[in-house]
Amino acid sequence: MSAEVIPMEPKKRIGNQEPTRSVILPYEYSLGKEAIEIYEKSKRKAFDWQKFLIDAILALNGEGLWTHMAFGFSVPRQNGKNEVTAIRELYGLNKGERILHTAHRTTTSAAAFNRLLAILEESGLEEGEDFHKIK
């Protein structure tokens, strides 16, 4: 007698995928979609809540200036918070911005640096040819 194979249903996300509280100022448009497209070239996939945050972080007003000069978020018990920062940093690097990532511990900033290098390499870019690292 053979065992019957029962296909499993894909797991559905449990809980609200949007913040329970947020203060996002009105804006004209966002560069978030472009940032996500750059990020997803690395074969990584952004979650909906990450896209929501990136849209707000990269929001511009009618004059083309950043809507939010500072942006903070608290997402307790959720994986992927550091990836939001990586998405923003990756976007900035692609636009010629200089990125300074600080942290309380050297190991934390080194981990962020290595994560960003991995994303660049997973995107098909080569160190020395497409980008230069300064450590």
Q: Predicted regions span which residues?
A:
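Phosphate/NTP-binding elements of NTP-utilizing enzymes
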Residues: 2-135
